[in-house]
């Protein structure tokens, strides 16, 4: 997996991206695993600094608001979102949530 190193946004901002919602939690001896739905949907994610096990991942995506009910945080992910349009990057959570509701979700 590729870690985010260079982005056009910074921690504390909110981005609107498409991801697969959690379908169910599966208990395991090491904690929980989850299965995802096959269809992706848009959500609002806050960009937070993240360091774990001595590895600096630069940032972590944490779902907020309504998105927190259907998504799990992403510590590692495969895209740097460098092609994310500026219109999908917000400094205010309520504006990001309004944008998703009005323009991205049917």
Say what each PLM segment does.
Residues 22-59:
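Short beta-strand-centered aromatic/proline hotspots
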Residues 7, 29, 34-37, 65, ...:
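Generic low-complexity, intrinsically disordered sequence content enriched
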Residues 53-106:
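Intrinsically disordered, low-complexity, charged/polar segments
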Residues 8, 25, 36-37, 41-42, ...:
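Compositionally biased regions
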Residues 1-14:
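Mixed-charge, Lys/Arg-rich low-complexity intrinsically disordered regions
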């Amino acid at each position: 997996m590729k870690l985010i190193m260079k982005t056009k946004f910074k921690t504390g901002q909110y981005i609107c991206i498409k991801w697969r919602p959690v379908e169910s939690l599966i208990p395991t001896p090491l904690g929980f695993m989850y299965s995802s739905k096959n269809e992706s949907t848009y959500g609002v994610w806050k960009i937070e600094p993240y360091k774990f096990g001595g590895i600096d991942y630069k940032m972590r995506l944490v779902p907020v608001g309504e998105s927190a009910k259907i998504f799990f945080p992403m510590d590692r992910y495969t895209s740097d979102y460098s092609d994310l349009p500026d219109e999908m990057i917000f400094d205010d959570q309520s504006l990001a949530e309004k944008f998703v509701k009005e323009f991205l979700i049917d």
